[in-house]
């Protein structure tokens, strides 16, 4: 079992539950997120658990991979980066939206429910006033 964790507390809980490793995922990731940045979260989790830590969230190239290893991660997970791959069979409209997105083109919704989620800004999100 390798769960995704957004905090040190959850990483410790997953280790006690028998996880083989944890994926420490920062707020830069796409989809459901925690509140800690990847580069702050990873070394804290590394220091708190004895199992391998895999870094995730906002890692898109060799610099992010190298930084993750320098912070003690034993591996990295890249997600959004691969949405643009030819092999990825997502909707082409969404794929183009992700590829063309700039650094200010994402928005976090769901904070008021306790379930924050990073999304690409769209007309739909502006219409529902999230």
Tell me the role of every PLM-derived stretch.
Residues 1-53, 63, 67-71:
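Alpha/beta enzyme core
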Residues 40-54, 60-128:
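Conserved active-site-proximal phosphate/metal-binding subdomains
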């Amino acid at each position: 079992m390798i769960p995704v964790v957004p905090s040190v507390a959850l990483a410790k809980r997953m280790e006690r539950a028998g996880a083989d490793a944890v994926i420490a995922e920062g707020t830069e990731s796409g989809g459901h997120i925690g509140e800690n940045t990847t580069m702050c979260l990873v070394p804290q989790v590394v220091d708190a658990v004895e199992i391998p830590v895999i870094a995730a969230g906002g890692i898109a190239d060799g610099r992010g991979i190298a930084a993750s290893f320098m912070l003690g991660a034993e591996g990295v997970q890249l997600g959004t980066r691969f949405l643009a791959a030819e092999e990825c069979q997502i909707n082409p409209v969404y794929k183009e939206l992700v590829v063309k997105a700039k650094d200010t083109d994402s928005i976090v919704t769901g904070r008021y429910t306790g379930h924050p989620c990073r999304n690409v800004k769209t007309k739909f999100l502006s219409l529902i006033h999230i």
